[in-house]
Amino acid sequence: MALNSITYQKCFHTSAQQYADNKNKKVIIGMSGGVDSSVSAFILQQQGYQVEGLFMKNWEEDDDTDYCTAAADLADAQNVADRLGIKLHKINFAAEYWDNVFEHFLAEYQAGRTPNPDILCNKEIKFKAFLEYAAEDLGADYIATGHYVRRSADNENAQLLRGLDANKDQSYFLYTLSNQQVAKSLFPVGEIEKPMVRQIATDLGLVTAKKKDSTGICFIGERKFKEFLARFLPAQPGDISTVEGEIVGRHDGLMYYTLGQRKGLGIGGVKGLSEDPFYVVEKDLVNNVLIVAQGHDNSALLSTGLIANQLHWVDRKTIGDTLRCTVKTRYRQTDIACLVEPIDAENIRVIFDEPQIAVTPGQSAVFYQGEVCLGGGVIEAQLK
């Protein structure tokens, strides 16, 4: 398929006037060595922008040779930059990542919650440290990333929108952005679908064309999670108990489990109980007990709502009254119709139209009205 085909032109479409205006604007694209940022850089070029790349190293791997991916990712990013004829800057944000993301990540696990480091990483690194560095040190008018999201406008009222590809939409991870940050950010692949991204990369002959998507912890990579966490937090094994109080096994440490988890519990057949699988329904931090229940539809797994705090609204306005909208309590979840009620300036109560399974403290509740991501908060507690 030729890169000047009608199909591709839909990806790159820019009016003659906009193209001329773009030629005076500098964009720094965060290049991770993946296919999404690679194609994003190319699309920006086609839209007329002055494009330069930035590779961020945010994890020191001196003692981590088994999982050293940063060098390979940098090589891929440099290869793509050379292929596209753009400059690639390098920056080390490891100190910022440790102080502002990873220490919080550990503290949340230690407190028995299940955090989402990608959300905090976007807040503190990609759209704070990166944005500030690009603007102040590199003279950027915009930054760009390979996230599958869109924005509504190029001004202070910019809204964050879901990505065009519903299967890849990443707005859940970006709800902490303000409309000012959205206005200063470009998301080229948010306007197209993933198969087209890979097709463009293939036709360009980019080394990242067939590179698999990363699924590990933000910037740290794909590791054996239990072994990795044990290096930083001492495990405290304890009992696994049913909601009725019967001991049915031993756990390796509460931090290794999340609500709704079924696999990896190590509970065999228990005399007097059915063969239905066990699910984690609660963590008793005081007594170091993991509480389980049988059956996917067990009422112990269900929540009628949640309490959330650490709120971030994209327009940075607080909710003054009740709000009808939809919510996601985890990535890739189907939207849940709900009512949001302000408790005070820092806390909200969310009531689901239908009870939901495995609402997990530490994860984020992200709110939507149609295509617009309104913002969200961190789940503090379930409502039963």
UniProtKB/Swiss-Prot annotation:
It is found in: Cytoplasm. The keyword Cell wall biogenesis/degradation does not apply. GO terms for molecular function: ATP binding; tRNA binding; tRNA-uridine 2-sulfurtransferase activity. Catalyzes the 2-thiolation of uridine at the wobble position (U34) of tRNA, leading to the formation of s(2)U34. It comes from Haemophilus ducreyi (strain 35000HP / ATCC 700724). Disulfide bonds join 121-218. One of its GO terms (biological process) is tRNA wobble position uridine thiolation. This is tRNA-specific 2-thiouridylase MnmA. InterPro entries: MnmA-like (IPR004506), MnmA-like_C (IPR046885), MnmA-like_central (IPR046884), MnmA-like_central_sf (IPR023382), Rossmann-like_a/b/a_fold (IPR014729). The active site is at residues 121, 218. Belongs to the MnmA/TRMU family.
